[in-house]
UniProtKB/Swiss-Prot annotation:
It is found in: Cytoplasm, Cytosol; Nucleus. SMART domains: Sm. GO terms for biological process: mRNA splicing, via spliceosome. Interacts with the SMN complex. Core component of the spliceosomal U1, U2, U4 and U5 small nuclear ribonucleoproteins (snRNPs), the building blocks of the spliceosome. Most spliceosomal snRNPs contain a common set of Sm proteins, SNRPB, SNRPD1, SNRPD2, SNRPD3, SNRPE, SNRPF and SNRPG that assemble in a heptameric protein ring on the Sm site of the small nuclear RNA to form the core snRNP. Component of the U1 snRNP. Component of the U4/U6-U5 tri-snRNP complex. Component of the U7 snRNP complex. Component of the U11/U12 snRNPs that are part of the U12-type spliceosome. SUPFAM superfamilies: Sm-like ribonucleoproteins. InterPro entries: Lsm7/SmG-like (IPR044641), LSM_dom_sf (IPR010920), Sm (IPR047575), Sm_dom_euk/arc (IPR001163), Sm_G (IPR034098). This is Probable small nuclear ribonucleoprotein G. Plays a role in pre-mRNA splicing as a core component of the spliceosomal U1, U2, U4 and U5 small nuclear ribonucleoproteins (snRNPs), the building blocks of the spliceosome. Component of both the pre-catalytic spliceosome B complex and activated spliceosome C complexes. Is also a component of the minor U12 spliceosome. Residues 4-76 form the Sm domain.
Length: 76
């Protein structure tokens, strides 16, 4: 099994991020933590549904293998 390398996302800590997830889902929130497998903790998270509604879901942990794309919404 290959060893995971830590993702270089330290500079994005405490910044607002948008994550596209598998299954066409998308969330935005403030990055509070991550690990070498790109599992992330987001705070003040908002889920953007396909019918253009938004659900506030608070603090969440998202598994790295479900993340398709990451975009910084704040200046780094």
């Amino acid at each position: 099994m290959s060893k995971a390398h830590p993702p270089e996302v330290k500079k994005y800590m405490d910044k607002r991020m948008m994550l596209k997830l598998n299954g066409g889902r998308a969330v935005t929130g403030i990055l509070r933590g991550f690990d070498p497998f790109m599992n992330v903790v987001l705070d003040d998270t908002v889920e953007e549904c396909k019918d253009n509604t938004k659900n506030n879901i608070g603090m969440v942990v998202i598994r790295g293998n479900s993340i398709v794309m990451v975009e910084a919404l704040d200046r780094v």
